[in-house]
Curated annotation (Swiss-Prot):
Record CDD domains: FCH_F-BAR
UniProt keywords, alphabetically: Coiled coil, Cytoplasm, GTPase activation, Vacuole
Major subcellular location class: cytoplasm
Extent of Polar residues compositional bias: 651-674, 767-785
PROSITE patterns per the UniProt record, alphabetical: F_BAR, RHOGAP
Gene Ontology CC annotations of this record: contractile vacuole; cytoplasm
Any one GO BP annotation for this protein: signal transduction
Protein known as: GTPase activating protein homolog 4
One annotated GO molecular function: GTPase activator activity
Low complexity bias (residue ranges): 533-562, 571-602, 723-741, 786-828, 843-892
Compartment(s): Cytoplasm; Contractile vacuole
Region (Disordered): 529-909
Domain Rho-GAP as annotated: residue spans: 322-513
Amino acid sequence: MASLIGSAKLPFNNEVELISDEIEKGLNDSTTIRKFFEKRAQIEEEYAKNLQKLCKATPILLKSGGTSDAFSMIVESTNQFSNHTISTIQRFNQDVNDPLAGFIKDLRGELKQYSLEGQNLAKERKQAFDSLKSSKALYEQMCNNPESDVMKVQQSEEEYKLQVQACNQYHSLYHQEKLPKIQNEIIRLETVRMQKMKTNLKKYITEFESIPQKQQQSIKDSEELINSIDTKQDIQSFTNFNKTLNTPTPDFQFESCESINGGGGGAAGRKSKKGGWRQTISVLKIGNAFMKDDGTIVNGNSSLNSSSSNINILNNPIVFKIPIEEIMFKQKSKFPNLDIPYILVLLVNLIKKLDNGMGMKTEGIFRIPGHTSEVNALKKLINEQGEYQFPPDLYSIHPIASLLKLWLREMPQPLIPNYVYDKSLECQSIEEFIVFFKFLPASNQKIITYLAGFLNELVQPDNVVTSKMNLDNVAMVFAPSFLRCDSQDMILANVDREKTLVKLIIEGYLKLSDVCPIQLDDIDSKIQIPSFSNNNNNSTTTTTTTTTTTVPSSTSTNITTNGASALGAESSTTPLPSLTTFSQSQSSSPPNQPSPSITPQQVSNLPPSYQPPQPPPTMAPPPLFNIPQQQQQQQVTNNNNSGGYTPPPLQYTQSSSNLPPIQLGVTNSPSKPQLSDKQKEKEKEKEKEKEKEKEREKEKEKEKEKEKEKEKEKEKKGHKKSSSSTSPNSSSLSISNFLSSNKDKDKEKDKEKEKEKEKEKDKEILATNSTPEKPVSNRMSLIFSQQLQQQLQQQIQQHQQLQQQSNGSPTSPISPSSANNSPSMSPSMVKRTIRPNLPPLQSGTSATTSSSSLTSSSSPTLTSSKDNIQKQQLPELNQQQQQQSPQAELKSSGIKSLLQRVPPPPSQS
């Protein structure tokens, strides 16, 4: 019931709720329409898929004629109709069903938002009504109470009037602005919904109208072909066929024994008689049985035909483009306990074991295709010759990986059959896939499980780092091997879905193996890579190791080995080992028995790949050069005594033909000796050790340089302190320190250049793989350089003494060695000592600074005499500094040029 405020009746305050209910009804109707569309599309799609299965399962009619052509047209038109229906349903789902579901969801969200706004508006309106009610009730209470104060009555009356005015204002605002705003938005939503539903209904009619039109067209085409059937012609052709069968046979004739035997008797006569009987029976062709020329009876309804076909299957090595059941039937006698095809196990294990077990780490495996000629050669060996032992040049990762993909893709039926193709693509987890997995054939289940385990191992992180084949790449590559889409229109659309399914299979390998365990009969361990696959240089399977002998050119030498006839007799049944001059198989015959010469040949019938590798042949003795025959035999026996047997003696035979000298044991190897893998590894290790030693030497030199720099800094600090303590004008010592530091830097640069030259020489030596010649130290050059240095020191000392004498300063010895070894010399003597080796010194060169630098770097006794020299030369240095300040740069440059003329000592490596 509506409430009252005085005589006024309050509204229900539920306008927005009523409008929202109407919108909700429209949304529910839209949902009902969408569900109808979805269910109709599902029914039509299932019906079309069932028609497709029916068309595929229907065989071709055996008899040709109008009826057969008409029926083929009906089947083909039905198949086209089903394909058209499936494409129409998929297009309708993309254009109508999926967008309509999203539209309804969005519409409900907006309606919910506006409903919340309406509820908030109703709460505000209710608060206004409640305030008006409370003010009116207070006013009535004050009026009815006679004891109430007049002032309070007037105050309550004014409040009541104000509340009435505010409530009226809010009420007008509510009906004019707030409620119409929400109503307009809700009306807009309803308008959009109605227009959207109208559009979808039109699309529904348009799409589904094309389905009966296509069906009517197919029925019309079939009807025209049925009307064109000429039954008279078909009946006439059948009658003619029957007439051709009623042909008279030749009459039987009496054959006497003499004519049968042909006068010769024996086997020849029996053979001719047998042939005549066969010819008679072959002419008769009684029933469905007849006899071929080779004597085999062919009967389409007899068990002999089935048994002969089984024998043909067993003798046929083909494993490509045939059903899995036929492959398993072929290998049952050889591998009775193997659950999957041997070709699959072989290729997978070759990929794992090639490149020393690093095959799965090969970059771009299964993505980079193998060479077409190599893949075809491998396929021909397996498919035509039944040979599972390949030549050395075909043991490569990419051709074998391509062969594995080719075998999977050439199977008549995919691993996941077409009847579960669509359902399997809808799987979102491995558990959903296992539901369909259990309905697959047992052989398909085991192959899928085995491949999933191999691919799971392939996408492990340690393999992906180098192979660059992660889970997505592997799933993309192997999706066509697991699944095949019959519809050309949906191949590109289902690429991502197929890849997702293969990823689920690879990741769920453990669950698949629990559902479908595999028995491999320990085949993995029996598959071995031949020894020649690891060595590229020595890729031949059989080699001849013989002794080298030199004979005259007029005679030919043939080495005959005992027991060769026995080997030749066994060659048809067992594979021959590599023939050598001295082998264990040849030591059984007596040593004195002569035997013919044997030419080593490469053996073709190698053992199967799944057998364990045989032990390597015994090594031959070292070659013999120009040794008498008795000594050769004695040396061979001594070399082979450790092997536990005595080899037969060598026998030489002379031939009359003039042939060039023969050297046995010379193989077609290159002229340069080929290093083995171990020797190459040792050389690499030696090079690495040399590089490490060089790096250590560099670090030690850097540490020494740092220590020298620290010492120099300490010396500089000490010189600064000494110069500040004595006098501020001691510039000669600072110049000497500067020159000494420059000289040290020059020496360090020279050392670095020498080291760089040595490094370049080492690199050249390593590049040419030639042993470098050891440099011979030249003693005369060392003596000559020492003499030049001594002369230079003497010249500097003499020049210093002359300059001090000219200035009137007392002379003081620079070093004890110079004072004892070099007395005072005249200027003419100085010139004579300078002229042969160096140009004469200029008059302005500073001898004091250069002598101090040389003495400081040559011996520790010179540094101890610095203080005495400074005390003696302090009064003179002040005057020299004032006179020679403009010439300081010339002096330093002259001394540097003089020092640069001294040749460096020869480098020794």
